[in-house]
C-alpha cells in the first residue's frame, strides 16, 4: 500500500499509531465541519425569522442590493404585463409567445414555465417564503419540497411589490381553475 508521512505532525500511516492518529484527526475534522454547518444553518434560520435573510438569486424584475430586493423598472414592466395579460384571459402559452416578440431575452427564450413561475411567485407582492424547499444533510444532497420536515417562514411586505396582493390572489385562483379544467379535459378526451 501507500504510506503517507506527515512531517509537520510527526507521524506516518505505516505504523498502527499513525493510522490511529490519522483516524482521530479525521473524526475531529468531521465533527468540526458538522458543528460549523449547524451554526451556519442556525444563523440563516434566525435571519429568516427576522425577515433579514435573502437567498442567492434575485427573481426576474429585481436586483439584490445588500439584503434588499430593488425593482429593475424595465423588468418590472414585463412582470406587470404578464399579470395584466393573464388577468384578462390571455393564456400562458400566448403570453410567452408575445414576450418573445416584444421583449426578447438576451440569454434565451421565454418559456411557459417561466411565465407560470412569475405568476406563482409571492415575491412579486413583496413577500418572501423561506424554506419551501430544502437540501437534507445526508446523501444524496438533492433539493426536495419541504412537507413539514423543517419550519417555513413567511415574511409579508419584505420589499416593494410589483403587483397588488389582490391581482396576485386572483391570478392564483385562475391558475387553480385552469389546472382543474386541464385535468378534466385530459380525462374527457
Kindly give the residue locations of the regions a language model identified.
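Conserved catalytic breakage-reunion loop centered on the nucleophilic residue
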Residues: 1-7, 11-22, 26-189
Amino acid at each position: 500500500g501507500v504510506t503517507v508521512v506527515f512531517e509537520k505532525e510527526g507521524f506516518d500511516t505505516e505504523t498502527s499509531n499513525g493510522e490511529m492518529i490519522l483516524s482521530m484527526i479525521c473524526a475531529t475534522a468531521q465533527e468540526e465541519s458538522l458543528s460549523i454547518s449547524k451554526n451556519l444553518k442556525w444563523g440563516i434560520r434566525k435571519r429568516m425569522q427576522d425577515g433579514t435573510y435573502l437567498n442567492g438569486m434575485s427573481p426576474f424584475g429585481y436586483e439584490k442590493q445588500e439584503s434588499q430586493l430593488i425593482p429593475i423598472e424595465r423588468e418590472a414592466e414585463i412582470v406587470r404585463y404578464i399579470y395584466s395579460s393573464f388577468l384578462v384571459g390571455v393564456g400562458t402559452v400566448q403570453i410567452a409567445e408575445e414576450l418573445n416578440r416584444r421583449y426578447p431575452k438576451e440569454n434565451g427564450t421565454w418559456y411557459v414555465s417561466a411565465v407560470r413561475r412569475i405568476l406563482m411567485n409571492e415575491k412579486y407582492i413583496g413577500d418572501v417564503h423561506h424554506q419551501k424547499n430544502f437540501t437534507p444533510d445526508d446523501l444524496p444532497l438533492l433539493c426536495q419540497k419541504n412537507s413539514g420536515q423543517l419550519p417555513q417562514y413567511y415574511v409579508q411586505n419584505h420589499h416593494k411589490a410589483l403587483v397588488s396582493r389582490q391581482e396576485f390572489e386572483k391570478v392564483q385562483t385562475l391558475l387553480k381553475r385552469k389546472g382543474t379544467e386541464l385535468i378534466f379535459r385530459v380525462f374527457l378526451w
